[in-house]
């Protein structure tokens, strides 16, 4: 049995693991990263962020072609199957894996394939296909990510019942689809399949879509999903899911029954903490498989850290990467350490959504004297040129100091547009001000110009 010694060992080669390993290596630590899959990238690259966003992009191009009058003059609408649009996603996945594998070799991080389990507080056992290795470490970072939560009373082995990972194995385009769970993943897939002409029933156990969003943005998403043919059912809980050779029947606790060609479960995720030997180091995950950490990403065992989806909120690839970097920054005593607690939300529905900061509801409950500046995309020259006129930018600011309190965007490129506002919000003191957008010259025509339009709109409300 081979034995190796490292300063830092990272378990999991997804975004948080990559961020942790790269940062530790840059600080001259001897680093190993352990991945139980054949290739790096984690759920983000293979089943989550990358394939779903590549799918969305392809579907959005199809929608643009089919709704643009200029294209209609030269041909009929075109429809593509789900497997066909998935081909582009597979190409992107391959490029991402190659790129990220090079990161490790270039930075002299040892990439070890195998399943890791703690033997004690300073040793890991790595079981590969043909060998067993022991690794001694000074510090460890658990970055094993998460997977879809699968209720035991639903038969996910049935060929018509999918979860948000296995849906990428779908070999045909269903005519009808039931999606259970109207969170971020469920809403994104509802947009994707509706764009392919699939009749979608979106079942929401809650009272409104994505309730953490600003109410106006949530309402806009509801409207556009319905406008694209998605039937949204709120306050519904499943009773049973039964599949047969001809379809799937969802029985709801309210007494309703819905039938479709396929069923997609998108309700909740669980941390990947099984078989890690956590009991050997005195760690116990919660009921969702997640590990508790302090403000330095340390678990209850001081030299063992955790980051990314395995610790829960916010379960975003962007935040996971920064959490991993932060965990290794604490190990290396990096002056740039920060606890990641203020991250923008990016939701890749069609149209997309992004926000950062407070919502109107939160500010109202806190009795903050705020006001609103709005810019509607239909009034922007760039949006008129591109034909992407659906959407808006909304700036929430303090009525007296003009401090920016929240940015909310709905429409094409929302996830890009939000970062301009985020950059100003993160400035200290008087630099965080609505005045920046009023006194700054923006390129024309651009979508960024929406900030000037919204700022002037908000300024006009002040008296």
Swiss-Prot record:
Cofactor(s) required for function per UniProt: FAD
Superkingdom of the source species: Bacteria
Chain positions recorded as FAD binding sites: 35-44
Subcellular location: Cytoplasm
Entry's Gene Ontology molecular function annotations: dihydrolipoyl dehydrogenase (NADH) activity; flavin adenine dinucleotide binding; NAD(P)+ transhydrogenase (Si-specific) activity
Catalytic activity, EC: 1.6.1.1
Record's function text: Conversion of NADPH, generated by peripheral catabolic pathways, to NADH, which can enter the respiratory chain for energy generation.
Stated family: Belongs to the class-I pyridine nucleotide-disulfide oxidoreductase family.
Record's protein name: Soluble pyridine nucleotide transhydrogenase
Naturally occurring in which organism (per UniProt): Marinobacter nauticus (strain ATCC 700491 / DSM 11845 / VT8) (Marinobacter aquaeolei)
Lineage, highest ranks first: Bacteria, Pseudomonadati, Pseudomonadota, Gammaproteobacteria, Pseudomonadales
Gene: sthA
């Amino acid at each position: 049995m081979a034995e190796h010694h490292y300063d830092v060992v990272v378990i999991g080669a997804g975004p948080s693991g990559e961020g942790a390993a790269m940062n530790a290596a840059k600080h001259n630590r001897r680093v190993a990263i352990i991945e139980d899959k054949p290739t790096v990238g984690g759920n983000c690259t293979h089943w989550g962020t990358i394939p779903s966003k590549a799918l969305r992009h392809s579907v959005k191009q199809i929608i643009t072609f089919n709704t643009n009058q200029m294209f209609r003059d030269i041909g009929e609408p075109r429809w593509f199957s789900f497997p066909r649009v998935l081909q582009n996603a597979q190409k992107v996945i391959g490029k991402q894996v190659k790129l990220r594998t090079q990161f490790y070799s270039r930075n002299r991080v040892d990439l070890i394939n195998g399943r890791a389990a703690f033997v004690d507080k300073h040793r890991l056992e790595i079981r590969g296909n043909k060998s067993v290795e022991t690794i001694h470490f000074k510090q460890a970072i658990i970055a094993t990510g998460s997977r879809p939560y699968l209720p035991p009373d639903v038969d996910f082995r049935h060929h018509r019942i999918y979860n948000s990972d296995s849906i990428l194995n779908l070999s045909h385009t269903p005519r009808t689809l039931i999606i259970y769970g109207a969170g971020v993943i469920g809403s994104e897939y509802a947009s994707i399949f509706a764009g392919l002409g699939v009749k979608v029933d979106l079942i929401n156990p809650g009272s409104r879509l994505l309730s953490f969003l600003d109410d106006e943005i949530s309402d806009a998403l509801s409207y556009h999903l319905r406008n694209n043919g998605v039937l949204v059912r709120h306050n519904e809980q499943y009773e049973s899911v039964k599949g047969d050779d001809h379809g799937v029947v969802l029985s709801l606790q309210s007494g309703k029954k819905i039938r479709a060609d396929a069923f997609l479960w998108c309700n909740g995720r669980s941390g990947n903490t099984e078989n890690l030997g956590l009991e050997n180091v005195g760690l116990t995950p919660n009921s969702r498989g997640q590990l508790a950490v302090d403000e330095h990403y340390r678990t209850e065992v001081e030299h063992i850290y955790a980051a990314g989806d395995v610790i829960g909120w916010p379960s975003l690839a962007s935040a996971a990467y920064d959490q991993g970097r932060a965990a290794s920054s604490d190990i290396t005593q990096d002056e740039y350490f920060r606890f990641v607690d203020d991250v923008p939300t990016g939701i890749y529905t069609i149209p997309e959504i992004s926000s950062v900061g407070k919502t109107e509801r939160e500010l109202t409950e806190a009795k903050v004297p705020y006001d609103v500046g709005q810019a509607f995309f239909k009034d922007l020259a760039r949006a008129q040129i591109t034909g992407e006129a659906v959407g808006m930018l909304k700036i929430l600011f303090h009525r007296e100091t003009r401090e920016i309190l929240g940015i909310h965007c709905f429409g094409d490129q929302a996830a890009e547009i939000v970062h301009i506002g985020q950059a100003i919000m993160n400035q200290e003191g008087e630099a965080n001000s609505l005045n920046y957008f009023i006194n700054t010259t923006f390129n024309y025509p651009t979508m960024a110009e929406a900030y000037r339009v919204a700022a002037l709109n908000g300024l006009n409300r002040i008296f």
